């Protein structure tokens, strides 16, 4: 297994799909990276030599991925919560942020029902 950005990339998959195992890289960005470094999308990771994997590693390193991206997202959410703005309050209360109704739906975000204490 090739190791790129601290993640073991699956060998048996095509390069364009295998790169999506990295947090922050979807199919479109994967296609862009492969086009940039000059590797075909339909080649499997196991067929790449070490030199091509190093080139691919450099291509991925240009983007914010994995731990750095996760940290950035959590810091953005924490910043909203510290500001006390509407979105920050909704994050703090674990409610939907984008105007969805909460009277009957939003069970995923709110969690399981809490029984009413008498």
UniProtKB/Swiss-Prot annotation:
Function as written in the Swiss-Prot or TrEMBL entry: Located at the top of the head of the 30S subunit, it contacts several helices of the 16S rRNA. In the 70S ribosome it contacts the 23S rRNA (bridge B1a) and protein L5 of the 50S subunit (bridge B1b), connecting the 2 subunits; these bridges are implicated in subunit movement. Contacts the tRNAs in the A and P-sites.
Gene3D superfamilies recorded: 1.10.8.50, 30s ribosomal protein s13, domain 2
Protein name according to UniProt: Small ribosomal subunit protein uS13
SUPFAM superfamilies reported in the protein's UniProt record: S13-like H2TH domain
Keyword NAD included in the entry's annotation: no
Assembly mode: Part of the 30S ribosomal subunit. Forms a loose heterodimer with protein S19. Forms two bridges to the 50S subunit in the 70S ribosome.
Organism, scientific name: Aliivibrio fischeri (strain ATCC 700601 / ES114) (Vibrio fischeri)
Entry's Gene Ontology cellular component terms: cytosol; small ribosomal subunit
GO molecular function, one term: structural constituent of ribosome
GO terms classed as biological process: translation
Region (Disordered): 94-118
UniProt keyword annotations, A-Z: Ribonucleoprotein, Ribosomal protein, RNA-binding, rRNA-binding, tRNA-binding
Top-level taxon: Bacteria
The encoding gene: rpsM
């Amino acid at each position: 297994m090739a190791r790129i950005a601290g993640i073991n990339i699956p060998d048996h998959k095509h390069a364009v799909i295998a790169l999506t195992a990295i947090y922050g890289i979807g199919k479109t960005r994967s296609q862009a990276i492969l086009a940039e470094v000059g590797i075909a999308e339909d080649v499997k990771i196991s067929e790449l030599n070490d030199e091509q994997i190093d080139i691919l590693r450099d291509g991925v390193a240009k983007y914010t991925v994995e731990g750095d991206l996760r940290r950035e997202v959590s810091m953005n959410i924490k910043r909203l919560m510290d500001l006390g703005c509407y979105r920050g309050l909704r994050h703090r209360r674990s409610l939907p942020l984008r105007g969805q109704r909460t009277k009957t739906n939003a069970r995923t975000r709110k969690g399981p029902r809490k029984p009413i204490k008498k």
